[in-house]
């Protein structure tokens, strides 16, 4: 089935069992398993349950006494699900690399980028297969300018705030478990976000209110 038919973000949104929000829905999970190659979905779920995923937020507002963790989740809900954030949220999606001494992995679902080896491998493969007359943009991005063809799917969507066009990265060409895991978390539903960050407490949301610490975070990624 094509990207035009399947709305992946709606499938991700159904991952949490409607009768028991402490469990995943096995039927939906089994269906999604077959939607992605190289056991990507299994690896993404394993990553979400690994305690190796972190969301760092440059925070000058919600870092107050009281229930700080809940307020940070509310910040993410406003940014990714309600679109009611009053200012541009500065955040970084980080995965701890399991290889000793390796730098953290930076994930950017807004621009469909990951610093991992798997992403780089498939990006270079796509680059090698690109004809000299072809633009890389045309090879990797699906542009939709017909409003009748617009989709509600948010998975692999670029610049979701545009009203005139829609752009989707062709994830069937380049995708990794890190991009898929964070997409499941942030491009699905509030229930799924809270399942992994609050209920199971496997994905950590951390506020940084000191600009020096924020810069050190980026230095550690580069190193």
UniProtKB/Swiss-Prot annotation:
Which GO cellular component terms are attached?
A: nucleus
Location of the protein in the cell: Nucleus
Keywords of the record, alphabetical order, are: DNA damage, DNA recombination, DNA repair, Nucleus
* Signal sequence interval, chain numbering: none
Indicate whether Nucleus appears among the record's keywords. yes
BP GO terms, sorted: DNA recombination; DNA repair
Q: Would the keyword DNA repair be found if you checked this record's keyword annotation?
A: yes
General function of this protein: Plays a role in a RAD51/RAD54-dependent homologous recombination repair (HRR) pathway to repair MMS-induced lesions during S-phase. Required for error-free repair of spontaneous and induced DNA lesions to protect the genome from mutation.
Subunit structure of this chain's protein: Component of the SHU complex composed of at least CSM2, PSY3, SHU1 and SHU2.
* Family named by the database record: Belongs to the SHU2 family.
Q: What is this protein called?
A: Suppressor of hydroxyurea sensitivity protein 2
Recorded name of the encoding gene: SHU2
């Amino acid at each position: 089935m094509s990207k035009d038919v399947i709305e992946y973000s709606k499938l991700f949104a159904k991952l949490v069992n409607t009768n028991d929000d402490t469990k995943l829905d096995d039927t939906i999970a089994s269906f999604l398993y077959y939607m992605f190659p190289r056991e990507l979905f299994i690896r993404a779920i394993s990553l979400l349950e690994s305690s190796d995923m972190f969301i760092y937020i440059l925070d000058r507002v919600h870092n107050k006494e009281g229930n700080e963790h809940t307020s940070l989740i509310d910040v993410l809900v406003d940014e990714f699900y309600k679109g009611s954030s009053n200012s541009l949220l500065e955040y970084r999606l980080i995965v701890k690399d399991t290889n000793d001494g390796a730098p953290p992995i930076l994930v950017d679902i807004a621009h469909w980028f990951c610093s991992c080896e798997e992403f780089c491998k498939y990006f270079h493969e796509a680059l090698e297969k690109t004809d000299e007359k072809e633009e890389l943009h045309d090879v990797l991005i699906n542009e939709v300018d017909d409003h009748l063809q617009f989709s509600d799917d948010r998975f692999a969507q670029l610049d979701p705030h545009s009203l005139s066009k829609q752009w989707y990265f062709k994830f069937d060409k380049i995708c990794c478990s890190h991009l898929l895991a964070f997409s499941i978390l942030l491009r699905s539903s509030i229930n799924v976000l809270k399942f992994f960050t609050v209920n199971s407490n496997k994905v950590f949301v951390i506020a940084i209110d000191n600009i020096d610490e924020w810069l050190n975070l980026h230095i550690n990624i580069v190193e």
